[in-house]
Amino acid sequence: MKHLSGLDNLFLAVEHGNQLMQVAALGIYDPSTAPGGELRFKSILNFFESRMKQTPVFRRRLIAVPWGLDRPYWIDDTDVDVEYHVRHIALPQPGDWRQLMIQVARLHSRSLDKSKPLWEAYIIEGLDHVPGIVPGSFALYIK
């Protein structure tokens, strides 16, 4: 068990209702540059699963102290379901930049489940009509 840092505790304390204190990143990837020229969702799941074993932050979840007498603690969750945390979705048609931004905004507006490790990743396909993006590319949105 480890106490939340002051910054982590601050983010948690000021989060209320629609004011979510989440940090996120969005990357766009061309799977043709992967070894073999393709990348399957199962390979991405395997990658995250291997990183979960090496990186404690992917396994930590919150435990509150009764009556709020102290800052919450991080505990190591040994039973993290990678398929809960890494999700596979596709953009609705036409699959353009606007649709990608709408989807990312929707995902970002959802609170993380505080009973699980505090992260989610989304593989977003269907970017074929985003100008300047190679057809068949996908986005990785992680928060």
Protein language model regions, located:
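Non-catalytic N-terminal regions of enzymes
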Residues: 1-143
